[in-house]
Amino acid sequence: MLTTICLDADDTLWHNERLFQFTQERFAKLLSGYVASDHLIDRLRDAERRNIERYGYGIKGFTLSMIETALQVTENRVPGSVIAELIACGQEMLRDPIELLNGAEETVRTLAADFTLLLITKGDLLDQERKLAQSGLGKFFDGVEIVSEKTSEVYVDIFGGRGIDPRHALMAGNSLKSDVIPVIAAGGWGVHVPCSPSWDLEATDAPMQHNRFREITALSDLPGVIKDICGNM
């Protein structure tokens, strides 16, 4: 029987990626006089990929990647005013109020009544804490884990540290790469909850043939899937 339900935060409980994509569009407009938009976004994505190990996930690393890309594509000729605007973009992102996804609060409330409920999210500590506080959902969780990366080893450590048998744990989130595949590798159940738009750097194939993998169209479907899994364990 499942005893522990783990949930991702960004683009699982509240919108996140669309803010990044909106800012990317602003970035492209600011640099439109120097390089084609498509090429610029490719360069930004490459910078993000390189910088994850340096800065981790989140708005601060994204802002630094925009500045780095602006300097590269202009051969260090980008005006200081543009750099200032990019910094302002990052600051605006950090102030942006969150918006819960449809059914998020009701689903979290339902799950909290019957299971140990954990929030497992990756990203900047201060920003993730800010978003959780704004969401009003913190009161439903028995524990919160904000990590720099989501690997099978990280999930093993979280489960082990909390005395959780991974065979009785389920993780649900929008990222196959971070929320589903590593949890299955750690011995748990993984439920994919797609959200659009999605981040290219998290794209990977779904483990469709694995018996501990499920996919749903909305978070509100999760209690039903959990009931089905428990009924067949």
Segments predicted by a language model, with ranges:
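Asp-based, Mg2+/Mn2+-dependent phosphohydrolase catalytic module
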Residues: M1-L2, E105, R109, D124-M233
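Active-site neighborhood of HAD-like aspartate-dependent phosphohydrolases
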Residues: M1-R43
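Hydrophobic alpha-helical core bundles mediating ligand binding, dimerization, or RNAP-core interactions
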Residues: T23-A28, L44, E48, L86-Q91, ...
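Short, surface-exposed acidic
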Residues: S32-A47, E75-L86, F140-G143
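A metal-dependent, Asp-based hydrolase signature
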Residues: A47-E92
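Substrate-recognition element of Asp-dependent hydrolases with the DxDx(T/V) motif
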Residues: G80-E99, A104-S135, E145-E149
